[in-house]
Amino acid sequence: MGKSAQFPFHVWLPDSMEGPTPISALIHAATMVTAGIFMVARLSPLYELSETALSVMVIVGAISALFLGLVAMVQTDIKRIVAYSTLSQLGYMVVALGASAYSAAVFHLMTHAFFKALLFLAVGSVILGMHHDQDIRNMGGLGKYMPWTYATALIGSLALVGVPFFSGFYSKESIINAIRVSSVTGATVALIAVGIGLFVTGFYTFRLFFYVFHGRERFQRQQ
């Protein structure tokens, strides 16, 4: 739980976002926090021997997926929004592990690594264009100034939300189907939490997208 930054051991990850954004794209999206998910998947025969361990994973993962998504909804720092989004998506993977759907967890781990790295790099481009201002309240209307960044951020956002025909749709669907048929204690509550979490994901993702790329310009132009 601590390695994958799950509730209540999640407080360290947002503060680790202070480094360069390309490093965050590599470490946070594809390697560091996802190592805990991969470790549990590799040790699946051990976890299958304990019904209690599986139940704890389902419940903790569901809480993380929903609660940390709600936290992302109220953030104003662009990198922290993406950081809490990562924690929320890791919650989906933990739920899949608790439901013994190890292939679904690793599938979402792989798809998430690609579209979250894409989002991190888009965020880095925005921060550079804003002269290192990371407050989304100071942005707006950047779509016409950064068309390539706009396009990549849109693709990453659609995949994160789980729009059909994007990778996130298929991996999230496999997790939801796994928890729906699971008999582990807490599976029903987890299914409800994950279902609500899907709408929360859409809200904070497009809140970020429209705050940054659409609307009126809230920044001062610099030469």
Regions found by a protein language model. Give the residues of each.
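Hydrophobic transmembrane alpha-helices and their helix-loop junctions in integral membrane proteins
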Residues: M1-Q223
